[in-house]
Amino acid sequence: MKLRLGMSPISWSNDDLPQLGGDTPLEVCLSETREAGFVGTETGGKFPKEAGALSAVLAEHDLALVSGWYSGTLINNDLESELERIADQLALFKAVGASVIVYGETYETVQNRQERPLSSRPKLDDYDVAAYGRRLTALAEHCAGKGVPLTFHHHMGTAVETEAELDAVMAVSYTHLR
């Protein structure tokens, strides 16, 4: 298998903190991504949300869509509601040929809430981890069935931040979650 590398647009501008590169145009991000030798990119807040427009802007820079962040809330949400929430992004990623969709658990995250200290982040132990794993597995199976596998991204300020928390989630999640 040939390895292809993609880049994240957060290297140019941060969707959570727009004061960090918020004035950097998408054109700069994409042209510099390609100039650096990357063949793909993740999505970000500045990217078109319609398949034709997204495909066109990527083609202008000879880039593929490799992935993109999805702010999930399965830890405190039912599967059917989450399937509705992810549907548009999943369809977009399928249409544009994304390799994966990146799930981050964002229920009650401290991100975008600068008045809250990191220590006030949600704690995984406050939730039914086994039930969460079952819902996460079902979502991953659904996404894989649509041709866009789901990957899991632990993140600072969320209920799944530490290595131990990530291990706990992975221990109760199954085959289709990467």
Which role fits each region the language model picked out?
Residues 118-128:
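Glycine-rich tight-turn/loop motif centered on a GG-T
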Residues 20-22, 55-58, 115-118, 164-167:
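Short, glycine/charged-enriched secondary-structure capping and boundary segments
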Residues 45, 70, 105-106, 155:
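Active-site loop/turn elements of alpha/beta-hydrolase fold enzymes
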Residues 149-170:
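Hydrophobic, aromatic-enriched interface-forming segments
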Residues 175-176:
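Conserved small/polar residues in nucleotide/adenosyl-binding loops
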Residues 75, 108-109, 156-160:
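Short, small-residue-enriched loops and turns at beta-alpha junctions
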Residues 1-100, 126-137, 141-148:
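N-terminal pre-domain/capping segments
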Residues 95-120:
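Active-site groove signature of glycoside hydrolases
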